[in-house]
Amino acid sequence: MPPTVFIVSDGTGITAETFAHSILSQFDQKFRLVRVPFVDSTEKAYATLEKINEAIVQDGRRPIVFTTLVDSASNQIVKGSNALVLDMFQTFVEPLEQELELKSSHAMGRGHQNADTEEYKNRIEAINFSLAHDDGQSNRNLADADVILVGVSRSGKTPTSLYLAMQYGVKAANYPLIPEDFERGKLPTPLLAHRQKMFGLSIDPQRLSEIRNERRPGSKYAAPENCRYEINEAEAMMRREGIKWLSSTHKSIEEIATTILQEIKLDRPSY
């Protein structure tokens, strides 16, 4: 049985889980994740303590617990378990308080905006924009885009656009390059006025064929030779038009998004 890992937070737990994933990915080991969000009272802390100790009995080994609990009383309750407890606030906040000679706010949920903040509204607006401009659905207001992703079908444009919108508040449109564009040897007409905003995604033809076969098995659309043709033509077009691009084959969405932000010189806060 894989080791049990608890993600305990007084908020959504997104911060703690992201940190835990980064640390645990360094080990060639599968883990069983148990998320325990909104532990915002001592009663909930005691209930969490009980869950952790039950896991010790069931697994026959100590679980690992990542916590981001601001309330010291709740934190001490969870630390009373027999688990390996990794307290992110104690690890990072206390040394920073000493270094900065300041006391932190110790307020719960400060890492995520409320629905009435300007940052939150901007992020929702970016998500709506990206959804409305997914896969070339709309050509309206393309001038408002921060970036326009181009590439063949199934090269990773949609998930990257949505990640940029959700994580960074970037208005990311995406537009497919199709065989008709390659036959004409020109970019789609709606994109011609926005070259400076374009960024291309490519992908290994064999991997593209595998992905497309999941959607349309045995079709010309998914055939290896067709995928090679489309990728070769798309990359040639991007080079010809001076569009920066990268291969998404061996990159995570996070890596792709970070590279795009660097290349197009977009400086956005992560929410």
From Swiss-Prot:
What Pfam families does this protein map onto?
Answer: Kinase-PPPase (PF03618)
Q: Which keywords, in A-to-Z order, does the entry hold?
A: Kinase, Nucleotide-binding, Serine/threonine-protein kinase, Transferase
Fetch the NCBIfam families from UniProt.
Answer: PRK05339.1 (NF003742)
Write down what this protein is called: Putative phosphoenolpyruvate synthase regulatory protein
Q: Which InterPro entries match?
A: Kinase-pyrophosphorylase, PSRP
Read off the HAMAP family from this record: PSRP
Q: Please list the disulfide bridges.
A: none
Enzymatic class? transferase
Q: What does this protein do?
A: Bifunctional serine/threonine kinase and phosphorylase involved in the regulation of the phosphoenolpyruvate synthase (PEPS) by catalyzing its phosphorylation/dephosphorylation.
Is the Nucleotide-binding keyword given for this protein? Answer: yes
Which organism is this entry from? Paraburkholderia phytofirmans (strain DSM 17436 / LMG 22146 / PsJN) (Burkholderia phytofirmans)
Task: Give binding positions for ADP.
Answer: 151-158
Family note: Belongs to the pyruvate, phosphate/water dikinase regulatory protein family. PSRP subfamily.
In alphabetical order, the GO MF annotations are: ADP binding; ATP binding; phosphotransferase activity, phosphate group as acceptor; protein serine/threonine kinase activity
Enzyme Commission (EC) number: 2.7.11.33, 2.7.4.28
Tell me what reaction this enzyme catalyses: [pyruvate, water dikinase] + ADP = [pyruvate, water dikinase]-phosphate + AMP + H(+); [pyruvate, water dikinase]-phosphate + phosphate + H(+) = [pyruvate, water dikinase] + diphosphate
